Regions:
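Charged, amphipathic alpha-helical linkers/stalks
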Residues: 130-229
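Short, exposed beta-strand "edge-strand" segments with a Pro/Gly-rich flavor and a Y/T-containing core
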Residues: 28-35, 184-198, 359-362
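Generic alpha-helix detector with strongest preference for long hydrophobic helices that associate
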Residues: 4, 8-9, 24-28, 87, ...
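Hydrophobic, Leu/Ile/Phe/Ala-enriched alpha-helical segments that form helix-helix packing faces
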Residues: 47, 186-187, 355
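N-terminal cysteine/histidine-rich coordination modules
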Residues: 1-103, 107-152
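Hydrophobic, aromatic-lined core segments that form the binding pocket/scaffold
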Residues: 193-412
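Conserved aromatic-histidine-acidic binding/catalytic patches
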Residues: 31, 94-98, 116, 171, ...
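Short, mixed-charge, low-aromatic patches
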Residues: 1-3, 156-160, 302-310
Length: 412
């Protein structure tokens, strides 16, 4: 009997299987596909008649990178596609040589594996259309569960987090599990609107920052318990109702974040289609006055988006929960926990801007459009770490990183 490892994973992973030529996307189109050193050497010495010419001409060493993980890369063809795909968008390397010849990047996508305190966690990126369907359309929400996997399975670990040990005794990371469990439960608390849940997360983060600044991290669990008790009272809902809505500022910031990405280049036709529909749906054309665009935004929201999202709010909830889990929030790759909050608010507000614009363009919304937007948005935005850092910097440099400004970005 094979030895197994325990892995924490969202339940949708059990149902995931690549759908190959039926897929709307090509996994590697317009991406940098890295090759690990072991795979690079296997390709360069392979004598397969069909693949050898491509192995010799379409694979380049990364001479400025000393890492064995990003040792080389595949050179995309003139259409920005992977030269190893056949006419059905299937991988010729897999077909000719088998799964064992795939690089770490190609064998793992769209799976994303981390290690937390010695235990593996695996989720998937929503940039894969099939993952988007499985993860986002589940009305019951994302359920995390422990499964057993073969110890000899090929698993590429992205990175991880250690919350144990004396060196972390006074650091926020020690309370990772308390913070994580609270916030995932918060995002799935349907007694509150999703807007309110994200605002409450910001309130909690500010409390955590204050305790950390005062050297009272040990009080974090008690504070989280107190917030759980407060959320059971109607008084908090009344306070949240008093937060003002400012569509003009919301539009200005969110549009600027979107422009920053579009102007830097977008390698996804599906996302560009969504952007064009968003701009047309909001009347965001050359010479348009901001007040007219704001009026159109509010009109789309009330006519089309509000009705749809009241019934399908779980789609956006599932997206945020998946990102929160996958990115090891509030830590992961972020410099501070507030940076992670700026990120989650930014992607949430950008997705809503697109959907509200698209709802005006199509005179309504349906799941297929919503999935297309979120999947292609994830492909373009979430897969560009430099852009993620740039939007955090833009928000900070503009002076819009306070909780009050974050609430304006969130509130619809």
């Amino acid at each position: 009997m094979n030895e197994t490892l325990t892995m924490l994973t969202p339940s949708y992973m059990k149902g995931f299987k690549c759908i190959g030529p039926k897929c709307e996307e090509s996994c590697c189109y317009a991406w940098n596909v890295d090759l690990d050193k072991k795979t690079y050497k296997k390709y360069k010495t392979n004598q397969n008649e069909k693949l050898r010419p491509l192995f010799q001409t379409m694979i380049n060493r990364r001479h400025n990178n000393k890492s064995d993980v990003n040792y080389a890369k595949i050179k995309m063809d003139s259409n920005k596609g992977c030269p190893f795909l056949d006419e059905n968008k299937l991988c010729n390397i897999h077909k000719e040589l088998g799964e064992g010849y795939l690089s770490n990047t190609c064998s793992s996508y769209p799976r994303y594996t981390r290690q937390v305190d010695g235990m593996l966690e695996q989720s998937a990126t929503i940039s894969c259309p099939e993952v988007a369907r499985l993860a986002l359309l589940n009305k019951e929400g994302i359920i995390l569960e422990h499964i057993e996997v073969d110890k000899n399975s090929r698993i590429s670990i992205n990175n991880g987090l250690n919350t144990e040990g004396y060196l972390l005794a006074n650091r926020l990371e020690k309370y990772f599990w308390d913070i994580r469990i609270f916030n995932i439960s918060l995002l799935q608390n349907r007694n509150y609107s999703l807007d309110d849940r994200v605002i409450i997360m910001g309130i909690v983060y500010k409390k955590i920052e204050k305790l950390n600044h005062e050297g009272n991290n040990r009080d974090i669990p008690a504070m989280l318990n107190a917030m759980n008790d407060l959320m059971k009272e109607d008084s908090l809902k009344e306070q949240l109702k008093g937060i003002p809505k400012n569509t003009a500022i919301q539009m200005k910031i969110t549009k600027e974040l979107t422009d920053k990405k579009v102007l830097s280049g977008v390698g996804s036709e599906r996302y560009l289609e969504c952007v064009i529909e968003t701009l047309n749906g909001l009347g965001f054309i050359e010479g348009a006055k901001l007040e007219d665009v704001v009026e159109k935004y509010d009109d789309n929201y009330n006519k089309y988006f509000k009705t749809y999202i009241e019934e399908k709010q779980y789609i956006l909830e599932n997206y945020l929960v998946n990102e929160y889990f996958r990115e090891l929030m509030p830590f992961g790759s972020f410099n501070t926990i507030w940076d992670s909050y700026i990120y989650i608010v930014s992607i949430y507000s950008m997705i809503k801007l697109h959907l509200i614009g698209m709802s005006g363009y199509h005179h309504g919304l349906e799941d297929e459009l919503t999935l297309k937007l979120i999947q292609s948005f994830s492909r373009v935005v979430v897969h560009t770490p430099s852009y993620i850092q740039s939007i955090i910097k833009l928000i900070k440099d503009s002076g819009f990183d306070s909780l009050a400004h974050m609430s304006i970005l969130i509130k619809s």
